[in-house]
C-alpha cells in the first residue's frame, strides 16, 4: 500500500511538471541556432533575442508563435539578431516593429500581410537585403519609406500594395530592384507621391517595379542601369517632367514607360538594339507624352509594335540605317513630327497602322527593302506634299495602306501585283499609271480619288473590285473624273457589277483593243464598250505635265523640235514600231487636236497653242510609252 501511494504521488508530480513545462514552452522558445523568442501577453510584445540568424519557415503558419498571431502588437528584434527568417511574422496583428541595429537581411514574406503596421517605415542602415514580398500587403504603411544606406537588393514584391507617400530615395548601394517591388493596386495607392530618386549603382529594375505609382516630376535612369523590365514605370501618369535614360542601358522591356506623361525630348542611348512593344506608348493618357525631339541610336535594329504610339514628339523623325523592322502601330497618331519621313533601305517590314494619322509629315520616302505595304500603315498622312514612290520589289499594297493621305502623285513599281481594298481611298489628285504585271485591284481601291487621266489598265489585269474607281461623293459627283477606262488586254473579272457596287462609275465607257478576249457585243457587265486601235479619238483623256517618262516612270533622254511654219514635230529617237497616238490639250484639259505618228519624223498636229500639252501613247500590242510632253514656246500662235 505504501509503495502504491509513493508511485501515485510521483506520477502526480511528474504530470504537474509536464503541464508547467508545456505552459512555459507556449510563450517562449528557440527560433534559430542561437535565437530565442518570448511573448508577453500583458503587453502584446513578441521579442526576438539571442544572436545570429532566425530560422526560415517553409509555410506562413509554421512559426512557433502562431497561436498568438492576433495578439501580437509589437515586434522587437534584438540588436544581435542578423537575419530575420522567411515566413517569420506574416499576418500578425502587430502595429510596430523595432529593428535591431545589426539586422542584415529581412527574409521573404517576413512581414507579409501585417496590415496593422501604419505610418512610416524606416529600415536600419545595417540591412542589405529585403527579400521577396517581405512587406507585401502591409496596406497601412501610408507614410514615408526610408531605406538604409547599406541596402543592396530589393526583392520581388518587397513593398507590394504598400501605400507610401512622400519622396523615395533608392540608396546608391542598391544594385537591383525586383519585379513588382513597389507596385500598388489602384484603390490602395495615394493620389500623389513625392519624387523618385534612383541610386547611382543600380543595375536592374524589374518588371512592374514602380508600375502605376504616383511619383511626380522628372525621372533620371542612372548610367549604371543596364536593364529595365517590362512595365517597370507603366502608367506612372504623374511623372510629368523629363525622362533621361542612362548611357549604359541595353534593354528596355515591353511597355516600360507606357502611359507616363513625360515632356521634352527623348534620347535613346547607343547600344539599344530593340525598342519593345509599347515601350513609350501614350495610348491611355488624356494627352500624349514628350513634346521635343526623338533621337534614336545608330545601334537600333527593331522598333516594336506601338513603341511610340500617341506621343507628341516634334521635329524630324530620323530612322537610323540598320533598322530592319518597324512594328504595327509603332508611331500611330504621332502627329507632331514634320518634314520627310525617310525609311532607310535596311527596313524590310513596316507593320499595320505603323504611321497611321501621322499628319505632320510633308514627304514620304519608302525603303527599297519592302515587299509589301501593310494595312493602314501610311493612312491619314494628310500633310504629304511630294510624290510617293512605291519601290521596286513591292508586290502588294495592303488594305487602306494610304487611305486619306492626300498625296499629290504616286508611282507604282513594275513588280506590283495587287492593290488592296481602299488602298488609296480619297488619297489621289493626279494621273495614275498602272504597271504591266498588275493583276488585282480590290474594292474601293481608288474610290473618291480625283484621277486626272483616263484609267489605262495593263493586259495583266484579272480582277477589279466593287467601287474600285467610284467617284460619287456624298456631296456630289466630282466633275474632273474621266469618263472611260482603256484596257490593253482581255476583259477582267469585275467584282462590282450592279448599281452602287459597280467597279467604275456607271457612265464610264470601257475601251478595248480589238483581238483581245472577253469583249463581245456592245456592253460588258453593264458598261458600254467600244474598240480602240490607236487612231480613235480619246475625247475624255486627261493628263498632267509629269515630264517625259516611260510607263515604268523612268526618265527618257530624247530631243524633239517643232517647225514653226508647218507645225511638224521631229523626234530624234525611234518610238518603237507601230502606231503612236498623239493628243494635245489646253490648260483646262480640253482636247485641242489629235494626230497619228507612223514614223519618227512624219507627224503633224494642227491647232496647237503655246499652253497645250502633248500626250504620246504607243498603241501596239506591247505599249511602251505613256508620256505627256510640254510644248511650251516652240509652237506657233
Residue ranges of model-derived segments:
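Exposed aromatic-hydrophobic patches
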Residues: 570-571, 600-607
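Sec-dependent signal peptide cleavage junction
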Residues: 19-27
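Short acidic/polar inter-strand loop motif in beta-rich domains
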Residues: 618-628
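Structural signature of tandem-repeat unit edges
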Residues: 45-51, 69-83, 92-105, 115-129, ...
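Beta-strand signatures of extracellular beta-sandwich domains
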Residues: 579-583, 613-615
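Consensus positions within tandem repeat domains that build extended binding/scaffold surfaces
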Residues: 85-88, 107-112, 131-136, 155-160, ...
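Bacterial N-terminal signal peptides
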Residues: 9-19
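Extracellular/surface-exposed low-complexity segments
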Residues: 26-28, 502-559, 564
Amino acid at each position: 500500500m505504501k509503495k502504491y501511494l509513493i508511485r501515485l504521488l510521483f506520477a502526480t508530480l511528474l504530470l504537474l511538471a509536464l503541464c508547467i513545462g508545456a505552459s512555459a514552452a507556449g510563450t517562449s522558445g528557440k527560433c534559430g541556432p542561437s535565437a530565442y523568442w518570448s511573448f508577453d501577453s500583458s503587453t502584446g510584445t513578441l521579442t526576438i533575442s539571442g544572436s545570429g540568424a532566425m530560422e526560415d519557415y517553409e509555410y506562413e503558419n509554421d512559426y512557433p508563435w502562431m497561436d498568438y498571431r492576433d495578439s501580437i502588437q509589437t515586434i522587437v528584434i534584438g540588436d544581435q539578431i542578423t537575419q530575420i527568417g522567411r515566413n517569420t511574422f506574416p499576418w500578425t496583428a502587430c502595429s510596430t516593429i523595432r529593428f535591431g541595429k545589426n539586422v542584415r537581411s529581412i527574409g521573404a514574406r517576413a512581414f507579409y500581410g501585417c496590415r496593422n503596421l501604419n505610418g512610416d517605415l524606416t529600415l536600419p542602415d545595417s540591412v542589405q537585403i529585403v527579400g521577396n514580398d517581405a512587406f507585401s500587403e502591409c496596406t497601412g504603411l501610408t507614410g514615408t519609406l526610408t531605406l538604409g544606406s547599406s541596402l543592396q537588393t530589393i526583392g520581388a514584391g518587397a513593398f507590394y500594395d504598400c501605400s507610401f507617400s512622400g519622396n523615395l530615395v533608392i540608396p546608391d548601394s542598391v544594385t537591383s530592384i525586383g519585379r513588382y517591388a513597389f507596385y500598388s493596386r489602384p484603390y490602395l495607392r495615394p493620389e500623389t507621391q513625392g519624387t523618385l530618386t534612383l541610386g547611382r549603382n543600380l543595375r536592374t529594375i524589374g518588371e512592374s517595379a514602380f508600375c502605376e505609382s504616383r511619383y511626380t516630376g522628372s525621372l533620371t535612369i542612372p548610367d549604371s542601369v543596364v536593364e529595365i523590365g517590362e512595365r517597370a514605370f507603366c502608367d506612372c501618369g504623374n511623372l510629368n517632367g523629363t525622362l533621361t535614360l542612362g548611357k549604359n542601358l541595353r534593354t528596355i522591356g515591353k511597355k516600360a514607360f507606357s502611359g507616363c506623361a513625360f515632356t521634352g525630348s527623348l534620347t535613346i542611348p547607343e547600344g539599344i538594339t530593340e525598342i519593345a512593344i509599347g515601350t513609350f506608348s501614350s495610348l491611355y493618357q488624356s494627352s500624349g507624352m514628350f513634346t521635343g525631339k526623338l533621337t534614336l541610336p545608330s545601334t537600333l535594329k527593331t522598333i516594336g509594335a506601338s513603341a511610340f504610339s500617341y506621343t507628341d514628339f516634334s521635329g524630324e523623325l530620323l530612322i537610323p540605317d540598320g533598322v530592319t523592322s518597324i512594328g504595327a502601330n509603332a508611331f500611330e497618331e504621332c502627329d507632331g513630327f514634320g518634314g520627310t519621313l525617310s525609311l532607310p533601305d535596311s527596313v524590310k517590314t513596316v507593320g499595320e497602322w505603323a504611321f497611321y494619322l501621322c499628319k505632320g509629315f510633308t514627304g514620304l520616302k519608302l525603303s527599297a527593302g519592302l515587299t509589301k505595304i501593310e494595312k493602314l500603315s501610311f493612312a491619314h498622312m494628310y500633310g504629304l506634299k511630294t510624290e510617293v514612290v512605291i519601290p521596286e520589289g513591292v508586290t502588294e499594297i495592303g488594305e487602306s495602306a494610304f487611305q486619306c493621305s492626300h498625296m499629290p502623285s504616286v508611282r507604282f513599281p513594275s513588280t506590283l501585283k495587287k492593290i488592296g481594298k481602299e488602298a488609296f481611298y480619297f488619297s489621289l489628285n493626279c494621273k495614275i499609271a498602272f504597271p504591266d504585271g498588275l493583276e488585282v485591284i480590290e474594292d474601293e481601291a481608288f474610290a473618291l480619288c480625283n484621277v486626272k487621266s483616263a484609267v489605262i489598265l495593263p493586259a495583266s489585269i484579272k480582277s477589279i473590285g466593287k467601287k474600285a474607281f467610284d467617284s460619287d461623293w456624298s456631296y456630289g459627283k466630282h466633275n474632273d473624273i474621266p469618263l472611260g477606262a482603256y484596257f490593253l488586254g482581255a476583259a477582267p473579272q469585275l467584282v462590282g457589277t450592279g448599281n452602287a457596287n459597280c467597279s467604275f462609275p456607271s457612265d464610264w465607257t470601257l475601251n478595248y483593243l480589238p483581238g483581245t478576249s472577253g469583249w463581245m457585243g456592245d456592253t460588258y457587265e453593264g458598261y458600254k464598250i467600244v474598240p480602240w486601235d490607236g487612231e480613235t479619238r480619246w475625247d475624255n483623256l486627261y493628263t498632267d505635265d509629269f515630264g517625259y517618262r516611260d510607263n515604268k516612270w523612268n526618265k527618257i533622254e530624247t530631243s524633239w523640235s517643232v517647225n514653226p511654219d508647218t507645225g511638224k514635230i521631229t523626234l530624234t529617237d525611234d518610238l518603237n514600231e507601230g502606231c503612236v497616238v498623239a493628243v494635245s490639250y489646253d490648260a483646262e484639259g480640253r482636247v485641242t487636236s489629235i494626230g497619228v505618228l507612223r514614223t519618227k519624223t512624219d507627224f503633224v498636229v494642227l491647232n496647237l497653242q503655246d499652253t497645250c500639252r502633248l500626250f504620246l501613247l504607243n498603241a501596239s500590242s506591247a505599249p511602251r510609252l505613256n508620256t505627256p510632253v510640254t510644248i511650251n514656246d516652240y509652237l506657233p500662235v
